[in-house]
Amino acid sequence: MNTSLKTSKRQTQAPRSLAQHARLDMEGVVGQQSVPLLKALHILTREGQLNQDSRRKLKQVNHLVQLIEAPLRECAASADFSEHHPLTLVDHGAGKSYLGFILYDRFVAQHTSGLDAQPAKSRNTDLQETKSAMALQVFCIESRPELVEKSAQLAQEFGFTGMKFLNVLSQDAGAQSEMPAKVDVVTALHACDSLSDDAIEFAVSKDAKLIFLVPCCQAETASLLKSNRALFIHKTPLAELWRHPLHTRELGSQLTNVMRCLYLEALGYMVTVTELVGWEHSMKNELIVAKFTGQKKKLAAQRLVALLDQFGLEALLKTRFARVKEPLTA
């Protein structure tokens, strides 16, 4: 083989510049999303660049969207949804409504306006769009009025008519007149402390078919463990699991999510737990996915009650897990 030709070929393949690497990396993160929308959300800078914090947030939301897409489309295909009867998704603790905007853009706006209707630089055209539009209505629940107002203005600017923003606590969202009697999907991304429990209660009360939770800062259980530490340290060696404050927080977090999964199984949901993103992006990356099957597991309810008793958390049976009724027999 002609080695000079081989060398010449290598020499003509110039290495990628840092700018090219940055562009490819940004395209990989931004994907099919609307660049103008990401700029309006301040995820991208005015120049269309990503900073480290924005990169982390966008990767988290995009990964969640990827995990949601298949079950969401399956749910949409299982019923006769239309413009007059759309699939309803409710996002609790919406904050700046990143998730709601990106979901609506991904499943509705890109199809109704068409990719060709936007400038070539507005989207990553390397990715091919093959999915059909979805009849989707998105409710974003947020307690901070300034965020709700800004999100509503942004939705109006982009013509996202299927998005609604409610300035209300998650625990009160179900009683709002704008809220349908039944919803299809409930999400709560990085839902702090008991917000995940409020989202679960909302989802169950509204007969939600799908629930996606990324819990965060589970302080309630840790506080209860701390309060009963002195009593239980003399009753059971299990109390060593929460004798030290650091272990109390860790155990409280783990135990809370385990009990939430059991609770959902007891109420007729099939539950899976997976990782939202890699550890390098967030330490709070546990994703709980629940799909309603109607098959209530009595064993799950029994084990939930047993755990509450074992760890001195019986009070939660009347608050967070009130739909599980005692006594439970095999």
Residues covered by each model-derived region:
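Short beta-strand element of Class I
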Residues: 136-139
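Short helix-capping segments at alpha-helix termini
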Residues: 109-114, 129-134, 158-160
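Intrinsic-disorder-associated, low-complexity terminal segments enriched in Asp/Asn/His/Tyr and depleted
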Residues: 124-126
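Conserved SAM-binding loop of SAM-dependent methyltransferases across substrates and taxa
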Residues: 96-111
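Conserved class I S-adenosyl-L-methionine
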Residues: 85-95
